């Protein structure tokens, strides 16, 4: 893998029902760029930068990948933090909820047109901009932890498991690092592939998740990788990671949103999900 660039850190969210992901590229520390990743072609569309702190673990992508809910903070003026809905790869808000402090913001999609909102959405007036088919409801403790497909591991205390979409009993397990290697934002988790009694340590990438075809997606040191792990325990040498994109050289640039980024992706009909 490429040499480390301490100014670039990547995190991504894979849509639950579509081969699309959003990628957050952080660096310098108070700037984040969003990119849309077409997982079928491994092409990326670079979008807007956000000046501020993005809380990636409070964000979610709609099942079809058309909408993003994100939680961010600028910590100045009357609005310290906020939760917003946008169309990837743009941060331009379609709906906006001001917050107070870094606790309780964000949201999770339960369907294409329903959002579970964090506890610090203090102003719902901007929802007048949403189509009538879009619904927002209060935080649901049962929905929030499982929104990205990971669930508590029954085999390792404090770890979370996500089975491969391709089956074969292959599981991606992540657990928090301890000691000096740990990061307070949780992004330096230990990642391990597990199949029965066999284990393959993946180290501490910034992020890892499954594509819908069963390949493993990884982000490390400012780069995105894809890895075919279907037979990793049968033929270990056949599962080398393939570089998808090197995002380290990106520099901030102002970008006006196109017209479609300022409009909801579905109309005012009711009953849409």
Regions inferred by a protein language model and the residue ranges of each:
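Sequence signature of WD/YWTD-type beta-propeller architectures
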Residues: 1-273
């Amino acid at each position: 893998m490429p040499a480390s660039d301490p100014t670039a850190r990547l995190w991504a969210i894979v849509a639950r029902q579509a081969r699309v992901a959003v990628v957050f590229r952080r660096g310098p520390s108070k700037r984040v760029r969003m990119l849309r990743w077409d997982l079928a072609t491994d092409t990326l569309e670079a979008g807007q930068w956000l000046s501020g702190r993005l809380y990636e673990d409070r964000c979610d992508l709609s099942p079809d990948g058309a909408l993003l809910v994100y939680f961010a903070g600028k910590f100045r003026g009357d609005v310290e933090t906020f939760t917003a809905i946008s169309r990837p790869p743009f941060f331009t808000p379609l709906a906006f909820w001001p917050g107070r402090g870094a606790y309780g913001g964000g949201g999770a999609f339960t369907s294409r047109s329903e959002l579970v909102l964090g506890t610090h959405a203090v102003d719902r007036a901007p929802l007048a901009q949403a189509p009538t088919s879009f619904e927002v409801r209060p935080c649901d403790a049962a929905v929030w932890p499982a929104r990205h497909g990971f669930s508590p591991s029954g085999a390792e205390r404090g770890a979370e498991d996500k089975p491969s979409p391709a089956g074969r009993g292959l599981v991606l397990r992540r657990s928090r690092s301890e000691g000096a290697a740990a990061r307070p934002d949780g992004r330096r988790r230990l990642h391990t592939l597990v199949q029965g009694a066999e284990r393959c340590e993946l180290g501490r990438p910034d992020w890892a998740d499954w594509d819908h075809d069963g390949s493993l997606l990884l982000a490390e040191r400012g780069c995105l990788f894809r890895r075919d792990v279907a037979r990793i325990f049968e033929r270990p040498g056949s599962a080398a990671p393939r570089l998808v994109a090197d995002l380290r050289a990106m520099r901030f640039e102002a970008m006006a949103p196109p017209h479609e980024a300022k409009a909801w992706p579905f109309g005012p009909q009711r009953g849409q999900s």
